[in-house]
Amino acid sequence: MAKSIIQEDKSHCFLCGMNENLEPIAEHHVFFGAGRRKLSEKYGLKVYLHNNKCHIFGKNSVHQNAGVDRAVKAAVQKIAMRKYGWTVEQFISIFGKNYL
């Protein structure tokens, strides 16, 4: 498993910033579906989120709120492009879409 290039600290939620004492933290592959989960793993494009509140079930979680999901994808795309020296076109050629 590749390390996240987004977060070194796995004990704090990427969205709310609170620590794991609130609830367990889960790994979230930012880009998923159609083989993109494996690409997220390969390039370290994953964040750590409170499993229920911020990841899966909360009204502002990445899996329930399209706006939050899109904002996380845009932020991570910027970081990945800077880290790997990709252009927008190169990012699209790998992940199939521009989130900026």
Go through each PLM region and give its residues:
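Short flanking/linker segments adjacent to small metal-binding domains or redox-active Cys/His motifs
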Residues: A74-L100
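Histidine-centered nuclease catalytic patch
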Residues: F14-K46, N60-Q64
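Short Cys/His-centered divalent metal-binding micro-motifs
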Residues: K46-V72
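Hydrophobic transmembrane alpha-helix bundles
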Residues: A2, H63-G67, Y99-L100
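Post-HEXXH active-site segment of zinc metalloproteases
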Residues: E41, R70-V76
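Short, flexible, mixed-charge glycine/proline-rich loop motifs
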Residues: M1-D9, L39-G44
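Intrinsically disordered, low-complexity segments enriched in small/polar residues
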Residues: F31-G33, I56, N65, K83, ...
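General structural signal for secondary-structure boundaries
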Residues: N21, K42, N51, W86-T87
